[in-house]
Amino acid sequence: LRTCTVFMDTDSGRRIKVVCRYQQYRAARKIVDRLRLGKTQESRSGVVWHTQGSGKSLTMVFVARMLRAAADLEDFKLLLVNDRVDLEEQLSGTAKLIGGKVNVIESTAQLREHLSTAASDINMVMVHKFQERKETLTNTVAEALGTYLALPAGQTFGVVNTSERIILMIDEAHRTQGSDLG
């Protein structure tokens, strides 16, 4: 009950109690169980498939709250990854329900900095921050020349932290599987 109940403020200003639905509870429990019982990276990882509007963001909150409440799992670094500004704003508001500070990553450099620490913190980042890009021409120069070159292809982000106590929870992951992100 402690990890699967949150209080949220609505747009009208009312505070409401939100209780985890069965499918959210089941998914969150399975994630926690896999982290505890999995012997390999593969057996500790997985995919949770939710339909649109089924409460993916809240499921992520319930997982995080379960982890923070468990003495053997509370030291995990959490990385909540999304792919759109509006989704980041929604997830940011929902992530505050976990409790504690939520770091909103604004740049690739800041992402490297936060990932490289041993802190068991909560970080939110947009997926494109994992790409290393080097601009060939600034937008101003390209505009003056009348040349709009395609953005340069991203380079591999590389390993920043070798800890196995990092959890990535990716919202709308299917949209990252095309173009330079896939």
Regions found by a protein language model. Give the residues of each.
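Conserved two-lobed SF2 helicase motor
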Residues: 119-131
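A generic local structural motif
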Residues: 65-67, 108-112, 152-157, 182
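ATP-dependent helicase/translocase motor core
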Residues: 1-77, 82, 86-101, 118-119, ...
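SF2 helicase catalytic motif II
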Residues: 142-150, 155-182
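Functional beta-strand-loop-alpha-helix junction segments that form "active/interaction loops"
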Residues: 102-116
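Short conserved micro-motifs at the rims of enzyme active sites and ligand-binding pockets
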Residues: 134-137, 180
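Residues immediately C-terminal
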Residues: 87, 129-132, 175-176
